[in-house]
Design a protein with these regions (language model features):
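Beta-strand/loop substructures that line and gate deep hydrophobic ligand-binding cavities in soluble
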Residues: 1-27
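Intrinsically disordered, glycine/charged-rich C-terminal tails and inter-domain linkers
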Residues: 228, 444-445, 451-501
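Catalytic core regions of nucleotide second-messenger enzymes
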Residues: 316, 362-369, 395-412, 427, ...
């Protein structure tokens, strides 16, 4: 079976003529041409928005509602996914995207992702890791696990080979399975500007033609790309950048590698060759509706249900941003000596259970424990701070009864790499090294926070609402040159907690 999908946008005096020609062609291809004519005449939205404006299939919705009852605690997600599955077009049903569905129905993203993950365990969904083309963002390769991901991939639509080196280029999606499965269908590239969110502007220019264009770039980073020659230039939006961008000698432009431009920039474009040129501005900013590999791997629900899934040995993915919490029991050697091995070991195990409970409550995940130290990840700085404060509150309360030792905590955020270590997902990089060294500076009466994390506006807003004080400190961290600024957060008072049973 072969299916072609096309969208035509006509403007100016030629629109009426072409419409009349198409209407005559309905004798040969009546259904196809009729739909094409309707699309040309229609001013209705296209893509996802148009798909969700359709009337739900009542029978399909009832079938989905009945099957999804196996996931009883997720009442809101059951209703939303049943509605989505009964009205979305075939193209969107081939890749169920949890964040896209959650945003449309105004549901919590992580709960919706947990719903799909739980559903795979009972056979309602199948899970796919999609490798996305950096140009058109289409899913070019799929695998059932992170371990099966291929590093080198080819996109036929864009005519490029690319390597998977960033976690943002790997997205988790799902398909209905079992009794509610749908027939598989090929996914075609739909890389025209009106339906591909990454394409900001795409423009043709005839041989020896000149054009002056006023562009508005609302994002942070873009790639200027020639459809024949590929990548030309990386553009960074900066108010101090160029107000005019001259595009004439493409090879010379490519050698500049990166240029800063203003958000409102004038492009002076001249095609000096004998062939048509097509230039495209691709937005390189992260896509916030994609459940990317770095986000999913940091969630407690994924680590709990798919604890054995990790990248293949030797493969690594760059992670743009994660928040790390490091903790360590103060004086653990003395603890074992005073309490004895058996009692001290039980205390440490109880400590891990406490940490797991409070970290998971804020959608964080424990990556690993080393001795009595804990390394945990969060997607959000405020969630990490909330967990750290709750942990310290608990220890402050129980240390007064001499039932728990002191605990040191440090927080830092930034980029890192995701790797396979001993068949489990792990992280490495300078961000983690700094967090580890900050833990050396912590005491059991404070929470050490890196200067970069502390200065974030959302962190400042969060801290202003907490009953804590802070002091600034500067030290040379072991293994790093120069002093680094960090902050010591201290609880003003201990609040009664009932955080774990």
């Amino acid at each position: 079976r072969v299916r072609a999908e096309m969208k035509v946008v006509l403007r100016g005096p030629m629109k009426g003529l072409i419409l009349r020609k198409l209407q005559k062609a309905t004798l040969k291809f009546p259904a196809l041409i009729q739909e094409l004519v309707l699309n040309i005449q229609s001013e209705q939205p296209q893509g996802f928005e148009a798909s969700m404006s359709r009337v739900p299939d009542a029978n399909r919705k009832q079938q989905l509602l009945q099957a999804l009852q196996k996931l009883d605690p997720f009442h809101a997600q059951i209703e939303a996914v049943a509605d989505y599955g009964s009205r979305a077009s075939e193209r969107f049903l081939q890749r169920l995207r949890p964040y896209e569905i959650a945003d449309f129905y105004k549901l919590p993203r992580q709960n919706t992702l947990a719903f799909f993950l739980e559903g795979t365990q009972v056979g309602l969904f199948t899970l796919n890791w999609d490798i996305l083309c950096p140009a058109c963002r289409g899913a070019k390769k799929q695998s059932k696990s992170l371990r099966e991901l291929e590093r080198k991939v080819h996109c036929e639509a864009c005519g490029i080979n690319f390597e998977v080196i960033e976690s943002k280029d790997v997205e988790l999606s799902f398909r209905f399975a079992g009794e509610i499965a749908i027939e598989p269908a090929p996914i075609y590239c739909i890389g025209n500007p009106s339906r591909s969110p990454t394409i900001h502007v795409q423009m043709p220019l005839a041989p020896h033609e000149k054009r002056k264009l006023a562009l508005h770039l609302p994002g942070k980073t873009y790639r200027l790309r020639d459809m024949k020659q590929g990548h030309l230039l990386r553009l960074v939006v900066d108010h101090r950048g160029l107000a005019d961008l001259h595009v004439k000698d493409l090879e010379r432009l490519r050698q500049q590698n990166e240029v800063a431009v203003q958000a409102d920039v004038i492009m002076h474009w001249e095609n000096t060759g004998d062939q048509w040129q097509v230039l495209r501005f691709d937005c390189l900013d992260p896509h916030h509706d994609a459940a990317t590999a770095d986000q999913v791997a940091a969630l407690p629900s994924y680590r709990h249900l798919f604890s054995d899934d990790a990248l293949r040995p030797g493969m690594q993915l760059g992670v743009g941003h994660l928040v790390f919490l490091f903790s360590d029991i103060r004086g653990s050697t003395q603890l074992y000596r005073e309490l004895g091995d058996s009692k001290a070991f039980r205390l440490v195990q109880d400590h891990f259970a406490l940490m797991e409970s409070l970290i998971r409550k804020e959608d964080g995940a424990i990556v690993k424990t080393i001795g009595d130290a804990v390394m945990a990840t969060f997607l959000d700085e405020r969630a990490a701070l909330t967990a750290a404060i709750a942990i310290q509150q608990y220890y402050e309360e129980h240390r007064q009864d001499n039932t728990l030792p002191g605990l040191k905590i440090a927080l830092h955020s930034g980029p890192c790499i995701m790797v396979n270590l001993n068949d489990h997902m792990d992280y490495f990089g300078t961000t983690l090294n700094i967090c580890s060294r900050l833990l050396d500076q912590a005491t059991d009466e404070d929470i050490v926070v890196s200067g970069s994390l502390f200065d974030m506006p959302k962190v400042q807003d969060f801290l202003s609402q907490q009953d804590i004080t802070w002091t600034q400190d500067e030290q040379v961290l072991r293994g790093f040159q120069g002093t680094r600024t960090f902050f010591r957060l201290k609880l003003r008072r201990t609040m009664p907690t009932r955080l774990i049973s």
